[in-house]
């Protein structure tokens, strides 16, 4: 199967939608104060997403800069939203900044002043077409009626105030668009948030100097990222105050909240400070208690708080208690031991049991494996598939104890890895699985980290182009909504939103990694690469960036990072060293061995020529565990199979030396195979290979003056059988540039 086709196929399987998950959706529509793509500016709609619980509601921000209540309708953008609306959904509607001015100027976006039913017919200067222009209030009333006709709840929001002060007060719109928005909501019996008045009061309490810091430079209309965050927090509180509206049920708690990574049955990392964080009412005292320790802190102005519990020894079970004067949370059956992040694409997401929850699942002999999975000291947190444009506070998921019922849905690689660590080290083990089928590595890296590297500029520019194209094409969103409405079973219609595409930069970091940072952990294991075959040339830089990014996020420059080199795939070739995309990707992956505190599990011997998802996940997990036990826990033994160290030409042969020999080299079965040599013309032929102590000597009567050697240099290097004394396979390599 061609790699790109594989990626598209799996994306179709893995792309989730709010409709099929049965959750309500909040749609946000408005102008640039709600969503802004101008550098240095941000609208409140994007950070508002992080205030909602992703397990309860989906949030889609369809606001776009430069639009008014009139043009959002005439450009077909509202029709695109309507195509998605279903009973139980919500729509937040904020316009007004662009509704003033001349009706028929170069933008043709102004609406008639007021809330009346009067209209004016114009011939637009922009395209010569006739248009009947309504009042600002009439457009809002249409949005309200249309939303209600679909069973959704519309919420009208008055426009945010501009940063213009007079006599110590900030300007309001109580007799203009703010008033007309309120009147329209009242006429149609819709919910109304007087955001203009609420924010004006909050800005005045801050004063002109601090308020200026919430806006983008000298711009008095558009907020900075800090201002957008501030406004989003105010909006979340305003939503909580709505009467006869269930939208607040989808919000994260406003009094005392901790992210879902904190739940019953969690495992906390031993031997290092343990961060515990969340939100509470600004200024409130938050007290955290665990194992006889108590740490307190005051919530910041934005409600956020964090404490770092002193290092703990492995023990438990405990109860973690978090309280404020007005609220408390308690988490039971908390263990202290070793915590590992387990991430990557479908081979990491591949579950122990064959299950309908995953398209690729079920290890060899999975029924017996699941039945035997009784490991109460092993727990797993599985993050739900989530992609976002901006970093989130929460990802859906919960900790589960390893028993036959829960283990069926465990990542198989993570399970075998964790089981081996638990049995060898003898302490509780917690596994945090953040994996997404068909994902690229750049999807897991922070945007600021990617931006620092010029070699990733093309990836970021292309993603930016896709986002702009999708933003400017309401028909694509409308067509997707129509397809969802018709969908009953089978493959879910593909979401055209590039933010909901796991091939694009930073979207999985924002949705799945950001919410669990800075949960204390020992290290990370990684199984990914298939979806980056087309960018294998920059993969060494990408994997290095990922490692550096995670080490920076967790404040640990030596955070262990152990990863899987791609398994054998596709039909074996008769060519002695055919190469191929997968062979080159393995070379790209191996480059990370130069980074300290890393290790690579070689899997060329356990692949499946017909399936990129080999079912022998036990060997993969055990090899990763071996890397961790020797590299992180100091256990004796060799971490992996032989890894190329150097080669030297001696007459008509080449002598090859390896690291991680561990008492000698062996051939797994029969004569040593898999080597090819060539002179400077690089016409490789099969080589005769012989083990001499800890070295391999290769030659061929066809090559009198050998210059280069390759080993297992194929997508499926069938027959390559060099091992060390522990029967661990040697890593593929080539010496030709």
Residue ranges with predicted function:
Residues 7-17:
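Bacterial N-terminal signal peptides
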Residues 137, 141-162, 166-168, 175, ...:
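Conserved, well-structured core segments that form or line functional sites
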Residues 223-252:
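Low-complexity, Gly/Ser/Thr/Pro-rich intrinsically disordered linker/tail segments
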Residues 159, 167-170, 175, 241-252:
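C-terminal/domain-terminus segments
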Residues 24-35, 42, 50, 54-55, ...:
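Cell-envelope and extracellular/periplasmic
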Residues 18-24:
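Boundary at the C-terminal end of the N-terminal hydrophobic targeting segment
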Residues 1-5:
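Positively charged n-region of N-terminal signal peptides that target proteins for export
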Residues 154, 161-162, 167-180, 209-218, ...:
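Short, electropositive alpha-helical surface patch
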